[in-house]
UniProtKB/Swiss-Prot annotation:
Name assigned to this protein: Uroporphyrinogen decarboxylase
SUPFAM superfamilies per UniProt: UROD/MetE-like
PANTHER family noted in UniProt: METHYLTETRAHYDROFOLATE:HOMOCYSTEINE METHYLTRANSFERASE RELATED (PTHR21091), UROPORPHYRINOGEN DECARBOXYLASE (PTHR21091:SF169)
UniProt keyword tRNA-binding present: no
Enzyme Commission number: 4.1.1.37
Organism: Sphingopyxis alaskensis (strain DSM 13593 / LMG 18877 / RB2256)
Positions bearing the site annotation: Transition state stabilizer: D76
Keyword entries, A-Z: Cytoplasm, Decarboxylase, Lyase, Porphyrin biosynthesis
Annotated InterPro entries: UROD/MetE-like_sf (IPR038071), Uroporphyrinogen_deCO2ase_HemE (IPR006361), Uroporphyrinogen_deCOase (IPR000257)
Subcellular location: Cytoplasm
Reaction(s) catalysed by this chain's protein: uroporphyrinogen III + 4 H(+) = coproporphyrinogen III + 4 CO2
Complex and partners: Homodimer.
Signal peptide coordinates: none
Known role: Catalyzes the decarboxylation of four acetate groups of uroporphyrinogen-III to yield coproporphyrinogen-III.
Length: 342
């Protein structure tokens, strides 16, 4: 059988390459002039996410410009609560809003609308038909804990206090929210795979706000369930877990969830991660997004340190979180050249 030209996909399956594959979280976004032009023509962010032609174009823009090894689907983690029946909108300059906030049993009052995900599947099909053969196509979803923090509070927050309070005060009600998110997430990711993504990533952006016991209950257990069910349906599709802020709990996450690869945020020492994580587990990361903004010698040193930290482990170069809007395009070009040894 002919070997796949998709180096990033092969890395997720345990291969090592002379040149480290790379992509960047939020690589399709506001730092790109072509994205800003398209976003302005389409109006709101959510409208852009639900327009298959436009969302496919946004997904493809950084591939055309930079030739990344991976393309990440352009969408948002909050399409899941929208499909579960919450109202979702984005306030200019303030971020997402969801109504009603899921307190006092409000989950039971929601009327599910899974058809809201259909445009995302259409986007996946469009992108899959358009990508270069060497480019790995990555789908994604938010992990249950992170999605639940928005659903309970009705908005983003700095400390996730509303969800944390509910998890302590009424774990049965909070667990029902987690279960509803997990069930739809399996369906959603399976749909993405069926339409053509090569691998998927679970984003747990607020995993770092939990104690070890809560982390086990609300991060590890739900993600393990998603991975197990997804693998039963699609055993050959790699799953990347990204529990941002997990720190010393990363090893337990890696060992207990069953993910095929793990993403590191910028606070993790890559040398520590290489020593602490299960042998040969592929890792992804973990450049500080602000180092990419700064550029210069500091950027070069940070890139080199990460590349040197994984001498025998499969590694995908990425950021420790999403690229920020004021990142100079020239710095991204320099990053790619340095990672690829140009």
């Amino acid at each position: 059988m002919k070997a796949s030209p998709k180096k990033l996909l092969a890395t997720l399956r345990g291969a090592r390459h002379e040149r480290t594959p790379l992509w960047l979280m939020r690589q399709a976004g506001r730092y790109l002039p072509e994205y800003r032009a398209l976003r302005e023509s389409k109006g709101g962010f959510l409208e852009l996410c639900y327009d298959p032609e436009a969302a496919a174009e946004v997904t493809l823009q950084p591939i055309r410009r930079f030739g990344f090894d991976g393309a990440i689907l352009f969408s948002d983690i909050l399409v899941i609560p929208h499909a579960l029946g919450q109202h979702l909108w984005f306030e200019a300059g303030e971020g997402p809003r969801l109504a009603p906030p899921l307190v006092d049993g409000a989950l039971a009052s929601l009327e599910a609308a899974p058809q809201r995900l259909d445009p995302v599947y259409a986007t996946v099909a469009r992108v899959a038909a358009s990508l270069p053969p060497e480019t790995t196509f990555l789908g994604f979803a938010g992990s249950p804990w992170t999605v639940a923090t928005y659903m309970v509070a009705g908005r983003g927050s700095k400390d996730q206090a509303a969800a944390r309070r509910m998890a302590f005060a009424d774990p049965a009600a909070f667990g029902a929210i987690i279960d509803a998110i997990a069930d739809l997430t399996v369906t959603y990711l399976s749909g993405q795979i069926e339409q053509g993504v090569d691998a998927v990533q679970l984003f747990d952006s607020w995993a770092g706000s939990l104690s070890p016991a809560q982390f086990e209950q609300w991060v590890i257990a739900p993600n393990a369930g998603i991975v197990r069910r997804l693998k039963a349906l699609h055993p050959d599709t790699p799953v990347i877990g990204f529990p941002k802020g997990a720190g010393g709990k990363l090893r337990a996450y890696a060992e207990e969830t069953g993910v095929d690869a793990i993403g590191l945020d910028e606070t993790v020492d890559p040398t520590w991660a290489d020593a602490a994580l299960p042998s040969q587990l592929p890792v992804q990361g973990n450049l500080d997004p602000l180092a990419l903004v700064a550029g210069g010698a500091a950027l070069d040193a940070a890139i080199d340190r990460i590349l040197a930290a994984f001498p025998s482990r499969p590694h995908i170069f990425n950021l420790g979180h999403g690229i920020v809007p004021d990142t100079p395009v020239a710095h991204v070009e320099h990053l790619i050249k340095r990672v690829r040894g140009g």
